[in-house]
A protein has these predicted regions:
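Flexible glycine-rich active-site/ligand-binding loops centered on an Asp-His dyad
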Residues: 165-172, 176-192
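A broad, structure-centric signal for solvent-exposed, well-ordered loop/edge residues
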Residues: 141-143, 189-192, 220, 238-240, ...
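Hot-dog-fold acyl-thioester-processing enzymes
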Residues: 2-7, 12-14, 19-131, 191-264
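Generic structural detector for well-ordered beta-strands
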Residues: 133-135, 183-185, 210-213, 272
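A broadly conserved detector of short glycine/acidic/proline-rich loop/turn motifs that flank catalytic sites
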Residues: 76, 217, 225, 275-277, ...
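Well-ordered beta-strand positions in beta-sheet-rich domains
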Residues: 179-183, 210, 270, 303-306
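C-terminal domain-closing interface element
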Residues: 288-319
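Hydrophobic beta-sheet segments that form the core/acyl-binding groove
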Residues: 130-173, 266-300
Length: 319
């Protein structure tokens, strides 16, 4: 367990580092061993560990990947941090409701623990968040108590490398009330035989608003979310990774668009991150019906859609 011995106990263990119940091979999407956490992991040491291990990773779609499901029970939201997140993303503040994207923030430290581990086959450095699909089955109270579960669902070949899918679930009791699938891409040399999701072809969406993004938006989002990836913080740290300036967090761009669009209480959200947004900068939020985009000139940075779940009351758009 290494650095995590103080915040982790595997189900079925004796509390002294025993093996998790049910450990062994498991197929994608099946139940693997569960590791129960007593608190959310700290992101900074995970980022450091993942960075140090990255040069030794040899990514491939056929690689083994961790089957463990990390579980954090008894989760309650820090309302001050939530308010800071709502302000930086443009959501209403002070309501007893979680923004549709906020459970991703809660689950991200658990995902990082998996992706920074020795048994995760892809290098954390250079791993690109390419898309997210979120399903919220009902409105989530900010004052509620939840159980959070995160696991790696599988690897897939991509013409530019290898993709990994990471699943996050939020439960109340036995019921899944929110879930997401995030895809991340590790770029490496391939035979270009891997698949890539086909994008829906449609004309440009009508512009709704022009947003001038300040140079500190990455630092403000990092303070609210805990995601302090250096590419988002300052031009000097971004240049170390090949960017001329700091870039906006992909999940900030998605959250900002969804705050502007609004979402039904029971909703399916899809967002694809297509190009980085350099900071400071000016972008156009465009939308038509269910679809939305964030554009800079002729370049689409983010595209996505908001879809009411069938069989649920679509009245009363919330964020």
């Amino acid at each position: 367990m290494g650095m995590y011995a103080d915040d982790t106990q595997a189900e079925g263990s004796n509390g002294e580092g025993g093996r998790a119940a049910g450990s062994g091979s498991a197929g994608p999407g099946s139940d693997g061993p569960r590791t129960v956490l007593t608190r959310s992991p700290s992101l900074v040491p995970l980022l450091a560990a993942g960075a140090l291990r990255s040069p030794f990773k040899r990514p491939a779609a056929t690689s083994a990947f961790p089957r463990t499901r990390l579980v954090l029970p008894g989760l309650r939201v820090d309302l001050a941090r939530l308010a800071a997140y709502e302000r930086v993303c443009g959501f209403p503040t002070g309501e007893d409701a979680l923004p549709v994207t906020y459970p991703h923030v809660l689950g991200f430290p658990l995902a990082m623990r998996l992706m920074s581990g020795r048994d995760f086959p892809l290098p954390l450095l250079g791993l690109v968040h390419t898309s997210i699909e979120i399903t919220r089955y009902r409105e989530l109270a900010a004052s509620g108590e939840y159980e959070l579960t995160v696991h790696v669902d599988g690897l897939a070949p991509h013409r530019r490398g290898t993709e990994v899918a990471v699943v996050t679930e939020l439960r109340v009791g036995e019921d899944v009330v929110w879930e997401s699938v995030s895809t991340y891409l590790a770029r490496h040399r391939t035979e270009k035989t891997g698949g890539e999701r086909e994008r829906e072809k449609h004309g440009p969406l009508p512009g709704v608003a022009e947003w001038r993004l300040a140079g500190d938006i990455g630092r403000r989002y990092a303070a609210a979310s805990g995601d302090r990836n250096p590419i988002h913080l300052h031009p000097l740290t971004a240049r170390l990774f090949g960017f001329k300036r700091a870039i906006a967090h992909g999940m900030w761009t998605a959250a900002r668009c969804l705050a502007a669009h609004g979402t039904p209480q029971a909703v399916l959200v899809r967002a694809e991150f297509r190009a980085p947004v350099l900071l400071p900068g000016t972008v156009t939020y465009a939308a038509d019906g269910e679809r939305f985009e964030l554009c800079g000139g002729d370049r689409v940075h983010v595209s996505g859609g908001v879809y009411a779940l069938p069989g649920h009351d679509p009245e009363g758009a919330v964020s």
